[in-house]
Amino acid sequence: EACPAGAVKLGQKLCDKEGCEITYPQMPLPGNQPWGEHMWSHNYRDVNRINCYDTGTAPCKTACPAHIGIQGYLQLAKEGRYEDALALIKKDNPLPAVCGHVCNRRCEDACTRGTIDEAVAIDEVKRFIAERDLNAETRFIPKKTIPSLKGGFEEKIAIIGAGPAGLSCAYFLALTGYKPTIFEKNAEPGGMLRYGIPSYKLEKDLLAAEIDVIRQLGVEIRCGVEVGKDVTIEDLREQGYKGFYAAIGCQRGRKPGISGENAEGAYTAVDFLRKAGAKESFALEGDVVVVGGGNVAIDAARISSRCIDAKISMFCLEAREKMPASNEEIEEALEEGIELNCGW
């Protein structure tokens, strides 16, 4: 087995009795081999998730769904260049503070430091950088890069839905010189970020602050307008809109297909969390049972404990160590007195 840094093992012999050097397996280091196009890998995101030498892409960045320049912003943060670090993050992620609260940290799962002791706290650093800016007197507004000598574009673009996808689409369009309009049927923008994630996990003021930055780029958000009901695509075409992006999300709960799933008091987790997030009036009576072992199930259980003083029980198929929920979420649920029943 070769060490990627060319090191020898403790107690490994380097010479024989005659004093001659003993060769041992060594992995070629990137600095010792010529670099050229023959070393490139155009499919690095699919085939290169451990060793980053062939492409120069670290495992953390490869594992990140947003493909953020993680090594770069960590180095900039180390140097105290927080605004530069935020600018680098926002090249790929328009909502870094939100992500810092709800990200499942695939980057940290792939971090090779974790093979020694613990992974680098990548998500916490991103969260610190983003929240530091939101709490400042003057917030960082990304610089636009308009691919036209004439300035911004006049074409009107309509985006249907102000959830993460719609906000991201508007953000990147605005950075290239467009002034898109988002049509949102709910009273507030954010989609499942606002109506599906409990406030104890994601503060709504923080979400609103990051959306305000997107507005400052020239994005218009019209809430309380349901496309297809209050206005149609044809109506928007007549108003001069040339492009459309449907970001309506997937906000319907999934039922397990068992008897009693439509009984009174039975909710899908998505519907339940939306009602709680929208502060709609609904009553919980008696003990609460949550079926599932993922993070959404834990969200439903923990928000239930805040709605009613009763026994909250979770039932899931998986063993404790196989539960889809993160260990952090599980531990916090247990600390709040939620009963966990595995292997059902």
State the predicted function of each range.
Residues 159-183, 223-237, 252-254, 271-327:
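Rossmann-like dinucleotide/flavin-binding elements
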Residues 182, 186-217, 221, 276, ...:
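Rossmann-like dinucleotide-binding cores of NAD(P)H-dependent redox enzymes
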Residues 246, 268, 290:
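Redox-cofactor binding/interface segments in oxidoreductases and associated redox assembly factors
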Residues 1-153, 204, 244-262, 338:
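Ferredoxin-type iron-sulfur electron-transfer modules and their immediate structural context
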Residues 242, 264, 286:
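Conserved acidic residues
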Residues 77, 84, 151-160, 208-258:
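Feature captures the FAD/FMN-dependent oxidoreductase FAD-binding
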Residues 144-195, 201, 240-249:
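Compact, aliphatic and Gly/Pro-tolerant "microcore" segments centered on a short helix or tight beta-hairpin
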